[in-house]
Amino acid sequence: MDRVASQIYSGALPYITTMDMEDRLRNRIAAKAGAKFFKACFEAVVADKSGLFVLSGGAATACHIGDDRNVLKCLDFDYYNATQEWLQLARLQQRLQACVQDNLEILSRLAQSVRMQDDLFVVKCFQNGAFCFNGPVQARLVPCVETVRTSFNGEFDLLRFALQVELKALNGVDEYVDQKVIVDRGAAVFNVFFVNIRAMKGPLTMERCVRTLAVFGDAYRVVVSPLQSVINDQIMCLLKDIFTDKPEFRVARPKALICALFAKLPREAYDECINSHHGAEPTRRRDETVTSFCRRTLHIHGPALGCRKLVYAYFKTDSFARQMPDYVANRAIYPHTDCEMKWKEFIHFFVVAKV
């Protein structure tokens, strides 16, 4: 694996990461599954009555800007529980499995239609390993819903439900694990996440609102995160897209959504002066990651003032100096060390867009 890593660093070996692979499979499969599939998944989730499910992410954005053409790639929820009951994961997985079975034909057809380059090399994120696909690659849907649980942080635990796609190559798949090579392991399996649930560890303290999710119907009303929270989430998505080297057209999408969401903000959201620091300038704490600092600043001040606080911190403090977001800093053999240009792109958007 050391030899492979040196080839990647030198630019001699074209590659894609496992996270990028899963993202592209989601664009080819989940994003084309249709509103019927996601409506069934939505109703399967909210059928659990143990707590409150608040819609967030891309679907919440579509609700706030009134977009009935928005293509859903996944459903994101914040789950709040104030009772003695807890989320029934096994039953929820069974209901989502039924949704997949009802749409299995179209999902399988979408998986089989995925085309990739020959001799594909896929680097594992957060591990010292990789897959090497020898020859033409074929994709097949595994009709079982996978549940992935992660104790994420003190704020929430993350529950994710995924379709699984098996990738095979004509001449086999080799796997690199540390300094070993497993020759012709048969196939590699990748997750296509279509439902994400943040199980919040605290009580619901923010406002919530009811909006129409037009992609499910003109009168389909859902509980969604408030506008300012949705804007904050989209800003953090933009940061991730920039640092994970998404293509320019992919980065342009969250920028357009952020501008559309900002246009919905009330005028009073812009009234507070940027120089009012409430006794403390916006500065990253020593024990705080740069992504946590951005998220905290936006949460405390709201998106309108929060963005201006981040611009202030970029030019007036060293909060962003030599800082890499954790979702790329912790990747094994991540080849990019100069993050200054990416921070410039992120901050430049707030300046030019005048959000």
UniProtKB/Swiss-Prot annotation:
It comes from the Viruses. InterPro entries: AcMNPV_AC18. Keywords: Early protein. This is Putative early 40.3 kDa protein. This protein is required for viral late gene expression.
